[in-house]
């Protein structure tokens, strides 16, 4: 929400993946934003050709996407598409809001980089959180906002001066100890095992040719 409020104004249009996270469109509506859906495929991610047409026509004020561990597709955008997305943001000077809430739960080794890794001019705003990897109740996240860092910080300060100090201190100590990385490795193994079991059940119970 902070990222959208920073780079858009009521009446602006934003480009979203289709399908996308179910609550993103209502959020945009509450902010007075119009949404334009961009076709998104599990194998290739958001259509860069379709997005470039929108950008060339100057129809959108921002792009919102989930390149790694997409919700609801569960897939990640190919590396070349990420490079192209970062290049388009720089070329057309349009902010890309990268939702990385699930990115640390990737099963690929090594982990796939964020679009932000290819951002040469600060147009990509990377948003992440510990609510999906540690505890939903923490409600603690972070942003790497590039050229918009100051505006985001000012907006956050006006909205809420700080997060709960005890939670932040405990989380900081957990990160510094190295235990977080161990926790992530266990979590990835657990989820990967659950997916394998689910696929096995689908293979056993569904008609031949069913893909999961």
What label would you give each PLM region?
Residues 36, 97, 125-127:
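Hydrophobic/aromatic beta-strand patches that form the interior of the parallel beta-sheet core
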Residues 184-210:
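Conserved PLP-dependent catalytic core of the aminotransferase class-I/II
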Residues 26, 85-87, 96, 196-197, ...:
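A generic "structured core" feature
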Residues 120-189:
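Conserved core segment of the aminotransferase class I/II
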Residues 60-62, 94-95, 125, 140:
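Short, Asp-centered acidic motifs that coordinate Mg2+ and/or phosphate
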Residues 1-92, 103-121, 191:
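Conserved core of the PLP fold type I
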């Amino acid at each position: 929400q902070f990222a959208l409020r920073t780079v858009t104004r009521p009446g602006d249009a934003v480009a979203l993946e289709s399908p996308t996270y179910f609550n993103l469109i209502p959020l945009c509506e509450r902010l007075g934003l119009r949404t334009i859906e961009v076709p998104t495929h599990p194998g290739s991610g958001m259509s860069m050709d379709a997005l470039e047409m929108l950008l060339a026509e100057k129809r959108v004020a921002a792009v919102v996407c989930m390149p790694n561990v997409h919700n609801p597709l569960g897939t990640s955008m190919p590396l070349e598409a990420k490079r192209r997305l970062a290049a388009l943001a720089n070329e057309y000077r349009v902010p890309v809001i990268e939702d990385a809430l699930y990115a640390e739960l990737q099963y690929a080794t090594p982990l796939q980089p964020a679009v932000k890794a290819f951002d040469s001019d600060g147009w990509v705003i990377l948003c992440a959180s510990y609510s999906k990897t540690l505890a939903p109740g923490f409600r603690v996240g972070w942003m790497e906002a590039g050229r918009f860092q100051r505006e985001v910080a000012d907006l956050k300060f006006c909205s809420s001066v700080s997060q709960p100090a005890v939670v932040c201190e405990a989380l900081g100590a957990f990160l510094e100890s190295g235990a977080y990385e161990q926790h992530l490795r266990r979590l990835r193994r657990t989820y990967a095992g659950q997916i394998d079991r689910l696929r096995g059940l689908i293979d056993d119970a569904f008609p031949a040719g069913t893909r999961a």
